Every structure is written in structure tokens, then in C-alpha cells.
């Protein structure tokens, strides 16, 4: 069966499980990589500057 009836079965299994590297519940089972740290996609930890809030124009780390 495909189409609309199949979409009701999408919530049975979890999309994300706990990541081995960062420990957060962000590892996508189907895609095979972590949305938080990038484990499974790259050796480098996924990190962006916009993750930290700017205060007075200076970026806090």
C-alpha cells in the first residue's frame, strides 16, 4: 500500500535515537547520521557560529 494510508504508519518507530558521540537523541536511523554533531557524516564535530547568542555585538563562546 502506498499514499495517504501509509503516512499513518510513520510514527510507529522512532526517527531519532541516542547518538554514540554526543549522547543527544539526534541520530537519524534512516539517514545514518546525527543532526546535532554530524556523526556518521563527517569526522569533524558539526558546529556553527550562529549557535551562540551575540551580546553587544560580541560573540560569546
UniProtKB/Swiss-Prot annotation:
The record's keywords, sorted A to Z, are: Metal-binding, Ribonucleoprotein, Ribosomal protein, RNA-binding, rRNA-binding, Zinc, Zinc-finger
UniProt GO cellular component terms: cytosolic large ribosomal subunit
> Which cofactors, by name?
Zn(2+)
Give the domain of life. Answer: Archaea
Record: residues binding Zn(2+): 19, 22, 34, 37
GO molecular function terms listed in the Swiss-Prot or TrEMBL record: rRNA binding; structural constituent of ribosome; zinc ion binding
Q: How is the cofactor bound?
A: Binds 1 zinc ion per subunit.
Q: Which residues form a coiled coil?
A: none
Q: Where are the C4-type-classified zinc fingers?
A: 19-37
Q: Does the keyword NADP apply?
A: no
Keyword Nucleotide-binding in annotation: no
Q: Per the UniProt entry, what are the Gene Ontology biological process annotations, in alphabetical order?
A: translation
Query: Which SUPFAM superfamilies does the record cross-reference, listed alphabetically?
Result: Zn-binding ribosomal proteins
Q: What does this protein do?
A: Binds to the 23S rRNA.
Record-stated family = Belongs to the eukaryotic ribosomal protein eL37 family.
The protein in question is named Large ribosomal subunit protein eL37
Lineage per the UniProt record = Archaea, Thermoproteota, Thermoprotei, Sulfolobales, Sulfolobaceae
**Per UniProt, what is the name of the gene that codes for the protein in this document?**
rpl37e
